[in-house]
Structures are given as structure tokens and as C-alpha cells.
Amino acid sequence: MSLPHSQSRYELVKQDTGYSLERRDGVPIKAPDAREVVVKVRATSLNRRDIMVLRGAYPVGGRETLVPLSDGAGEVVAIGSDVTRWRIGDRVAALFFQNWMQGRPSATTGSSALGGALDGMLAEYVTLPEDGLVDFPSHLSFEEAATLPCAGLTAWRGLVTQGQMQSGDHVLLQGTGGVSIFGLQFAQAAGAKAIVTSSSDAKLERARQLGAAATLNYRQQPEWAEPVRALTGGVGVHHVLEVGGAGTLKKSLAALAAGGHIAIIGGLAGFGGDIPAASLIGRAARISGIFVGSKADFMQMNAFISEYRIRPVVDRVFNFDEADSAYVFMDSGSHFGKIVIRH
């Protein structure tokens, strides 16, 4: 297909406090440089980070305007003269960090994040380096693939790359947002036993239908560390996807098995508080900060998703002209799994 001359996209525009979300029409489409690819975006998805950016509570380098959202999938519609990896029509998803290919992140990894330091995916077309894309499992739709770059990869790196999850392990998943539900699906496929917490009995029932071995309502049992240990027969959990921060970290550690791993992926209750080092040492336990993952992690995750025919859980799909409503729904916290915008 021939490229149109212009497109529509959304921009965050700096205000006195935070940003406003505004649609822009008639925006030129950047022609690809020699090693770049133009992607027609078919779907994007939201993460908690996107709400933080909107509120001005997430560092974006002082930018006055930016295109939001890190997560998106689409098809290649134009390629630069030196591109060898992609062909017109290929289905691709974007990397959250455009320059983190493998191994450890570098000092410049953070400056390559889409929807933050770099313009993101909430546009009809994006132009990205050919190395900043991956293909995705053939059984997934664009809407499903758009959920993978942040939430899927964060769960994968926390449980598998860093956690080395094995069959029979006990896994504690806090809440039923995108990362936790991916964690549930990965654990179930790997033969691990997932324990899911939520304040909603209806969401806990949905988690059981997805394969959760046990569930716990933390509003009814606010001191949940010992009840969680009891659900493991007293062993404790081998993995935690920690999203609560200061509000839950000590409880997660109290529920942890010897040799266990806590993957800190968020801090809904803030990040203050002391790390109980003596308890970590005594249990030979580990705590890791998880900030999405590399391209190599993404490709390994995609192979696992393909092998086990995993389908991401999409709660609601909004149209492109309903992007503001998608933000409102994300901010409400009432979703189960992922929120997607269809382009």
C-alpha cells in the first residue's frame, strides 16, 4: 500500500499540572531512514505507567508534548533501503525499550522508552528502527499482540528471566491487572500454582476460571501473609509479582519461601519503607526491580506463548476516537487484564 501524506495521532500536551490528551489530525508521516520501518498501528494498549505520565508523575525528560503509549502492534507498510529483517505486510509489535536488545540494561536504556522519552504508539503510523520491533505469535490478533510489550514482558522477566519459575512452584500475584493476569497465565502453563489476591470476589472468580490454584480477598483478610503461607502448606511462595510497594512488600516477604524471589514491578502505595535485610539473608531470598525487559526476553516469551497457545486477556476494546474513555477506564482500576485501543 502507498503511504498517505498525513495521519491522526494523540499527543500529551503539558499543563500546569500533568498533561492533557489531545488529538492531532493532518500530522506528517515520517519517511523511513535507511534502517527504519513504517508501521501502520492496528492496536495499542494501556498500562498504569500511562496514567502516571498523564498526571506528570512519571519522568519524561521535561517534554512539552509527546505521543503516549508504549505498547502497540501493527503491520509493516514501508521499509528503508537497508532494512533486511522486515518485509511489507509483516505483523510486528514494538519494543518498550528501543535499544535494549539482550543481557543487562545500559545507562541509556531508559532514554529509549516509547511513550516517555520517545514518542509512543497512539498514532495511525509510527516510524521505528528495524531492531525496535519483534514479530508476534501467529495465533494472536493485533489487539492481543498489543498487550505484550510492557505487561506481558514484565511478568515474563519477573517470573522466568529473573525468577526461574519451575513446575510446582507457588506464585503470589497481587491484583488482577495486566501484569498479574499474564503472570497467572504463564504460571498455569508452566505447571506452577498461582495464588491471586484482589478486593473483588468477582475478579477472584474469574482468576479461578483462568487456572488460579487459590485466591484471597485482601480486603477481608488485610493481614494476608500467614493465610497465603497456609495455602502453600506452610512452605511459602517461591515467587511474588509485587505491585503494592510500601503497602505490601513486608507482607510479601513474610509469605516468601526459603530461596524465594520477589519481583518488584510497581508501587501503588508508594516506595518508602525499609528492606528487612536480615530476613532476606535468613531465607536466602532475592528482591529484584523489574523494568519490562529486553528484545531477547520478548522473543523467548513469544516462543512460550506460541507453544502453549496463550491468549492475552483483554477486558475492553475502545475505538481510536475513544482514547480518552480508555484512559478513564484504566484510571478507574475496574479492569481485569488489559485495555486495548483499536486503530
Stretches with model-predicted labels:
Residues 2-7, 234, 309-313, 325-343:
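C-terminal capping/lid region of NAD(P)-dependent oxidoreductase domains
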Residues 28-44, 57-101, 117-119, 137-139:
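Glycine-rich beta-strand-centered segment in the early N-terminal region that forms part
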Residues 97-174:
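NAD(P)H dinucleotide-binding glycine-rich loop of Rossmann-like/cofactor-binding domains
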Residues 109-111, 190, 201, 208, ...:
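Glycine-rich phosphate-binding loop and adjacent beta-alpha segment
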Residues 170-176, 188-251:
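Adenosine-nucleotide cofactor-binding segment
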Residues 180-181:
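N-terminal Rossmann-fold NAD(P) dinucleotide-binding loop
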